[in-house]
A protein has these predicted regions:
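C-terminal, non-catalytic "cap/extension" segments appended to globular domains
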Residues: 61, 65-197
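Long, amphipathic alpha-helical stalk/connector segments used for oligomerization, subunit docking
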Residues: 4-112
Length: 197
């Protein structure tokens, strides 16, 4: 939520831009806030998941999920993972993986047995878009960001999400916070609105 929906928003970039110019005058002398907004929201396939944009990020997750599912089902051998990975990056992202460091070995998850974790990253983005939409129903979240009213956003999360911890399931929390189960349409609307697609 904070990293993508807030920190990559036009309003947040405009808010911090004077500080960037103040504390890094040489680096930002001839830069406009619009340029920074486009830089942090530029859509381009990358090899590294953690360096990817909000849209193609989910292809990275999908590839890892497919591999894990195939490994668990026995339909993919460990010796075939590299080729499957490389073929998937070509198929989904149009990228030829140059080496394992930018490919199959870039994440630490599998080395410590972290199987099944990757989809939670995408789920987080999907929930965040729904929460953003829900907050925006009663408050102008863009105005809140412009005016540094982050405590109000934190309070909404504390009241509707964080206070429950593991007392409720994700779906129960989503239902109580937004009156519906997880709705991928919220993420789609968020992406379409932000990137004008």
């Amino acid at each position: 939520f904070w990293e993508n929906n807030i920190a990559r928003s036009r309003e947040f970039i405009d808010l911090i831009f004077p500080l960037l110019k103040k504390y890094f005058p040489a680096q930002f002398r001839s830069v406009q806030s619009e340029t920074i907004f486009h830089e942090v929201n530029f859509i381009e396939p990358t090899f590294i998941r953690t360096e990817s944009d909000e849209l193609t990020y989910h292809y990275h997750i999908m590839i890892r999920y497919e591999i894990e599912k195939l490994l668990i089902s026995g339909d993919l051998n460990v010796s075939e993972v590299r080729d499957y990975w490389n073929d998937s990056y070509k198929k989904y992202l149009g990228l030829e993986v140059p080496n394992d460091a930018k490919g199959v070995l870039q994440d630490v998850h599998w080395s410590f047995g972290g199987i099944g974790y990757f989809p939670t990253y995408s789920l987080g983005s999907f929930y965040a878009a729904q929460w953003y939409e829900e907050i925006n129903k009663t408050q102008d979240i863009s105005e809140m960001i412009r005016n540094s009213r982050f405590e109000e956003i934190n309070q909404w999360h504390a009241k509707h999400i964080h206070q429950f911890g593991r007392l409720k399931t994700s779906d129960e929390i989503c239902q109580s916070a937004t009156n519906r189960s997880l709705d991928f349409g919220c993420f789609e609307r968020y992406i379409r609105g932000k990137f004008n697609i």
